[in-house]
Amino acid sequence: VIGLPRSGTTFLFNLLSLDNNHRSPLYWEIMNPLPLVKNNKQEVWRKRKINLELKFARVIIPKLKNMHHIRAETPEECELIATMNVRSFVYICMANIPEYVEYLKNCSFTSVFEWHKKFFQMLECSGRPNRWLLKDPSHIGHIPEIITTYPNAKFINIHRSPIESIASFCSLTKNIRSTFSKYVESESIGETVLDFWQHSLNKGIDDRKVLPDNQIADIAYSEFINNPI
């Protein structure tokens, strides 16, 4: 599932994850994928640990609960896997570092998706699904790397007015950055967010031209919200 952030990607992702033919990575699997020791209590302990961490996150970022719903056992997007390669828009949300934004726009993501594949192969130790269902807004800017890593990947691109989605993401970024940075400027956030996602969207528009029609589907946000099923 691809599309600009705050464009209904999470709603669509969660809806599709209800299909038993799909498997999506759960938040606790991404944040704590390997047990310290092998016993039946490890999974329960890891889920409990993640829920405690999320409870703390909601304390330091009070508005997060209403802006982005996360629990240990809910499906989660791939972006947190990319943070392990230190190439993720998550860091843009945390601090104003213009040099990093330019780096992220122009660097290669080949190794990111090589690691991405290994990560999911590791999760498959508990069983290989019929199909992995994944979601990440930033994937819209990395279609070639995805196709190189997963030649049979299929994309669902959800479309929402950038005026609405970018404004919403700016608000989310401001709330996150306020936790990590002493000085937060709304104007700077707006410029950075607009620049980064404009670059990603334009790249995605060009890159998707190489995809055959049966490898990508488009959904309008307004139609999806009015009639999800």
Predicted regions and their residues:
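Short, glycine/charge-rich beta-strand/loop segments that flank catalytic centers
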Residues: V1-R6, E29-P35
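Short, charged low-complexity intrinsically disordered segments located at boundaries
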Residues: P5-F11, E43-K49, I143-P151, R177
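PAPS-dependent sulfation machinery
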Residues: M31-W132
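PAPS-dependent sulfotransferase catalytic domain
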Residues: N106-R131, D136-T149, A153-I229
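Glycine-rich phosphate-binding P-loop
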Residues: I2-N20
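Post-Walker A helix-loop "phosphate-sensing" segment adjacent to the P-loop in P-loop NTPases
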Residues: L18-W28
